[in-house]
Amino acid sequence: MAAPPGEYFSVGSQVSCRTCQEQRLQGEVVAFDYQSKMLALKCPSSSGKPNHADILLINLQYVSEVEIINDRTETPPPLASLNVSKLASKARTEKEEKLSQAYAISAGVSLEGQQLFQTIHKTIKDCKWQEKNIVVMEEVVITPPYQVENCKGKEGSALSHVRKIVEKHFRDVESQKILQRSQAQQPQKEAALSS
């Protein structure tokens, strides 16, 4: 069934809409679904970054006025091709990371151990669980309670690097705790001063 005139928007067209809240939205049509009356507009980035854009999903049932500024009549450009192997690799990596997290939880690893693992994994991808131990680059093993002194391995750059990561992790955790305590005490001080 063909859409009545004015109720169909071609990809690439420039449109302006006024919402029921009197907000004016303007942008390029990137998608339109006639049945659900949903319109996707590409607008300049609200962050102001030059190579970014905002995508707004607009339910046309809540729009009081739509104006087509520039109707695109020619065929829209073809969609960009997707690198399926890259997407599959990314999905596989994400799945492996989630399974690793699930393993750590099921193995009874402490929250501190899980957080340390995530911190190390951000820097060194070659990081895995071996029961409750963290194994980094097949060279360094960190055993519970996961402190610097629990880092074992052949003396060298790998062990030294992992120890530095562990030290920094616990410094950052301690700094965060101090900050949270001071923020928690602030309202108490203000309440005491006001009474």
Curated annotation (Swiss-Prot):
InterPro entries for the chain: AD, Lsm12-like, LSM12_ABD, LSM12_LSM, Sm
The keyword Acetylation is annotated on this UniProt entry: yes
Protein's name in the database: Protein LSM12
Region (Required for NAADP and TPCN2 binding): 4-67
Keywords from the UniProt entry: Acetylation, Cytoplasm, Phosphoprotein
GO cellular component labels: cytoplasm
PROSITE patterns hit by this protein: AD, SM
UniProt key word Ribonucleoprotein: no
Native source organism of the sequence: Homo sapiens
Role noted for this protein: Nicotinic acid adenine dinucleotide phosphate (NAADP) binding protein. Confers NAADP sensitivity to the two pore channel complex (TPCs) by acting as TPC accessory protein necessary for NAADP-evoked Ca(2+) release.
Residue stretches making up the Sm domain: 2-72
Subunit organization: Found in a complex with LSM12, TPCN1 and TPCN2. Interacts with TPCN2.
N-acetylalanine found at: A2
Residue intervals of the AD domain: 80-174
UniProt GO MF annotations: RNA binding
